[in-house]
């Protein structure tokens, strides 16, 4: 019998949800998606250090030796996203999704400018627009930015989508693709209700995507639907037939090792009759979002989470730049890392505030008092810097 992955691939485009190039090679998906958290995770893999260094060198060369560390790091962040994207496109035959800085989620003009910059970097590398999706958070401002970008020939993937109003607004804006977050919807309902689990068809995330799918197909919207953020195989099985599903390497591995019959659950040709068609403007969008506490809270949480991942990556890039440049930017790096981790601004970092691993915290905590002062970070990273530049 064929595996679940083999059967799923005949009815749904399977997309790898990872920045790990080896995982993408293993599963040979058509497309791949990345986000700040995935890029941050991939940046920890030693094999990819050369890609990080390439971006830092390129950004320093572009901006010049007099440019401040934060300028170089900010430029390198765009370079890194595109460098990983270019490597992914050497493996997958289809598209890669590259995300706009989540901190721009409520700024339409800044989002448009960043998208043009990212697609320009791809174009400079000889990659055409049809192979790239620019990921933008599904705020009203983000959706309006995507509407402009689509008219400019830049295709968009609207992410952090949790509510029906977001989906309808995206479809009416003519965006290429949306990514409703199945698992994060489930997370909210489990936390809100205290219920430990939901059977596949009862899963709130599955219900949400199914509703969006049938609505889009009933009213002939061209926007593709890519279910994302899965927590278990049942969610994937219940959405077999969706346009696309972006799946983590762990779940791809389970699908590829499980032999069982798989039934199509969603049918674009014969959708289940949807509710009456609606139209969404800014006022109705905001009203519907306020009324949907889950969507409102998860969108806010998602933007904050992706923003924090970017800030963490920037701090790591600043540290790496200091290593590459022989410590010239070291004091700035220490300050940036300290400010990022000192969440309550009281001048010390506790283990609970520390964003890194326990092993690193323990190494920096010389007096073992469970608190890091700026001098602890400076002396600890200084020793590491001396070793890496020796």
From Swiss-Prot:
Chief location bin: cytoplasm
EC number of the protein: 2.2.1.2
GO BP of this protein: carbohydrate metabolic process; pentose-phosphate shunt
Keyword set includes Coiled coil: no
Pfam families membership: TAL_FSA
Cell compartments where the protein resides: Cytoplasm
GO cellular component, one term: cytoplasm
Entry GO MF terms: calcium ion binding; transaldolase activity
Protein name: Transaldolase
């Amino acid at each position: 019998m064929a595996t679940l992955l083999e059967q799923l691939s005949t009815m749904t485009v399977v997309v790898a949800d990872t920045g790990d190039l080896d995982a993408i090679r293993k599963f040979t998906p058509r497309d791949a998606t990345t986000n700040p958290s995935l890029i941050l995770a991939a940046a920890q893999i030693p094999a990819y250090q050369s890609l990080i260094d390439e971006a830092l060198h390129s950004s320093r060369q572009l901006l010049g030796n007099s440019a401040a560390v934060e300028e170089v790091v900010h430029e390198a962040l765009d370079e890194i996203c595109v460098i990983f994207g270019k490597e992914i496109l050497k493996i997958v035959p289809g598209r890669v999704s590259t995300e706009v800085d989540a901190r721009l989620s409520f700024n339409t003009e800044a989002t448009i400018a960043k998208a043009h910059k990212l697609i320009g970097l791809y174009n400079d590398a000889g990659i055409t627009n049809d192979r790239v999706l620019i990921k933008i958070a599904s705020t009203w401002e983000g959706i309006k930015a995507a509407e402009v970008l689509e008219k400019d020939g830049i295709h968009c993937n609207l992410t952090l989508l949790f509510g029906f109003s977001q989906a309808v607004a995206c479809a009416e804006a003519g965006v290429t693709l949306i990514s409703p977050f199945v698992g994060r919807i489930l997370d909210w309902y489990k936390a809100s209700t205290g219920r430990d689990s939901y059977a596949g068809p009862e899963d709130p995330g599955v219900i949400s995507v199914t509703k969006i799918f049938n609505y889009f197909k009933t009213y002939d919207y061209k926007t593709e639907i890519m279910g994302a953020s899965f927590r278990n195989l049942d969610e994937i099985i219940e959405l077999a037939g969706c346009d696309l599903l972006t799946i983590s390497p762990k779940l791809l591995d389970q699908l590829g090792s499980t032999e069982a019959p798989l039934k199509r659950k969603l049918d674009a040709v014969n959708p289940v009759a949807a509710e009456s068609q609606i139209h969404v403007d800014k006022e109705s969008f905001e009203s519907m979002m306020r009324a949907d506490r889950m969507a409102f809270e998860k969108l806010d949480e998602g933007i904050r989470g992706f923003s924090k991942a970017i800030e963490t990556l920037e701090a790591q890039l600043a540290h790496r730049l200091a290593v590459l440049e022989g410590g010239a930017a070291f004091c700035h790096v220490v300050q940036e890392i300290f400010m990022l981790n000192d969440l309550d601004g009281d001048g010390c970092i506790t283990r609970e505030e520390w964003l890194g691993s326990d092993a690193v915290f323990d190494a920096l905590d010389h007096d073992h008092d469970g608190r890091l002062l700026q001098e602890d970070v400076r002396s600890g990273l200084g020793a590491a810097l001396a070793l890496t530049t020796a």
